Curated annotation (Swiss-Prot):
One of its GO terms (biological process) is cellular response to hypoxia. This is F-box protein PP2-A11. The F-box is necessary for the interaction with ASK proteins. Residues 23-69 form the F-box domain. It comes from Arabidopsis thaliana (Mouse-ear cress). Part of a SCF (ASK-cullin-F-box) protein ligase complex. Interacts with SKP1A/ASK1. GO terms for molecular function: carbohydrate binding. GO terms for cellular component: nucleus. It holds the Pfam family F-box.
Amino acid sequence: MGSGFSLFQKNLSSCYGDRDLLQPGLGDLPESCVALILQNLDPVEICRFSKLNTAFHGASWADFVWESKLPPDYKLILEKILGSFPDNLRKRDIFTFLSRVNSFDEGNKKAWVDKRTGGLCLCTSAKGLSITGIDDRRYWSHIPSDDSRFASVAYVQQIWWFQVDGEIDFPFPAGTYSVYFRLQLGKPGKRFGWKVVDTEQVHGWNIKPVRFQLSTEDGQHSSSQCMLTEAGNWSHYHAGDFVVGKSKSSSTKIKFSMTQIDCTHTKGGLCVDSVVVYPSSCKDRLMQI
């Protein structure tokens, strides 16, 4: 790809007129050839080079260029998000839509396609999870948070039995995915207009470890445990990985949980924001969530 970039950079001037009119340049390439070039670039690069000249702009709308960037099951993904597959959409329009963060399941889930890799990403809010005791205001409450994609998080003040369960049924494209719980020790708030985190009620998480579990309908399973120790910052705790095979052309159902049910002590002061499913190759992008 690097050599392709250098070729473009060396010939940029040829599109604008600082060359001999008898010398061929990028502006002379037929649109069909340009489309074949663009097919080998990532979506961000395609959009950048579409501004180069008329041929590049026209080629950037070719359906076969964007078909290669879309997840193979993009129709199923659109149906899951929208409830039906819209007619008369060009492939570039479909990619543009999917690369935005789209809400579904009454706003409790969000899904999008990574613009660089084309990998599918998904997250489900605390309200989309099954949390033991969530309706008892002595223990749990939903509080607003600017740090959440869903504008609110679940906060446990104090509890003996801590259990959070969830499941996702979605047409994931083939690949390996990682599941994370996004958590924070401490209660978010504001003081004099500044964001603050109150850690006064944080307790009990360094006595016994929290157990994270993940399973799929085809028998994959993983389990891990760790202490929660980092107060005041949002952290992603790995629940496990799962693999979607290339031959699968339907939804994949996963179940996951986070528990600390040792009732010899209470624990509290924890925010549960969401559960995130990300292509394992894109772990470095987690901090952007």
